[in-house]
Amino acid sequence: MKINFSLLDEPMEVNLGTVLVIEDVSVFAQLVKEFYQYDEQSNLTIFDSKIRSIRSSELLLITDILGYDINTSQVLKLLHTDIVSQLNDKPEVRSEIDSLVSLITDIIMAECIENELDIEYDEITLLELIKALGVRIETKSCTVFEKIFEILQIFKYLVKKRILVFVNSLSYFSKDEIYQILEYTKLSQADVLFLEPRQIEGIQQFILDKDYILMPYNN
């Protein structure tokens, strides 16, 4: 994946945990705005190896790690489908669940017989049962470090998202934690950009200095 904007001499490659530091505060703020308002006609361009522009729906922008809701409808749909698939691979467990659902249905319908109204019902599917149970990802006890890993893991689920951008996020973490985060992005083979307003000690990064010169830097 590559990005380009007016101050770059040429497009910049983004892959496997690229860190871009922008020292000019006003430029940093403007670029964050460009990402936030990104569409195919914006000054900021994001495109793949085939020079195909990335749609706004394919960009996942995170400006607040703890405030990001992992349990979106899209994530839950994928999670529930994945659980159904796992259960289908275990015939004994699936059979036990079906038997219990049938038993519960019989009990409820037996009670409904006394009702004066004519009552009918639909059989509940395994997917509907999982939804009804409110199955979701637990996030209440997350630290910032745990939450960013959950976001990175969720990004793999979101097949329609092609690039993940974190804004001003690495300042929350120690050197060792940053190393673990970047290592995980490499192992995940994910296109992830960390957009930062200041240099990060001890890691490889690209710095757009106040003279608007982009240089690789490893301190």
UniProtKB/Swiss-Prot annotation:
Molecular function (GO) terms for this protein are: DNA binding; metal ion binding
Does the record's keyword annotation contain Isomerase?
no
The record, for InterPro entries, names: CRISPR-assoc_prot_Csn2-typ, Csn2_sf
What's one GO BP annotation on this UniProt entry? defense response to virus
- Superkingdom of the organism of origin: Bacteria
Per the record's keyword annotation, is DNA-binding included, yes or no? yes
Q: Which residues bind Ca(2+)?
A: E138, E150
Q: What happens when the gene is disrupted?
A: Plasmid transformation is still inhibited.
Give cofactor(s), names only: Ca(2+)
Keyword line: Antiviral defense, Calcium, DNA-binding, Metal-binding
Per the record, a Pfam family?
Cas_Csn2
NCBIfam families reported in the protein's UniProt record: cas_Csn2
Instruction: Describe the function of this protein.
Output: CRISPR (clustered regularly interspaced short palindromic repeat) is an adaptive immune system that provides protection against mobile genetic elements (viruses, transposable elements and conjugative plasmids). CRISPR clusters contain spacers, sequences complementary to antecedent mobile elements, and target invading nucleic acids. CRISPR clusters are transcribed and processed into CRISPR RNA (crRNA). Binds dsDNA. When the CRISPR3/cas system consisting of cas9-cas1-cas2-csn2-CRISPR3 or just cas9-CRISPR3 is expressed in E.coli it prevents plasmids homologous to spacers 1 or 2 from transforming.
> How is this protein organized at the quaternary level?
Homotetramer.
Report the sequence similarity comment from the record.
Belongs to the CRISPR-associated Csn2 protein family.
Its recorded name reads CRISPR-associated protein Csn2
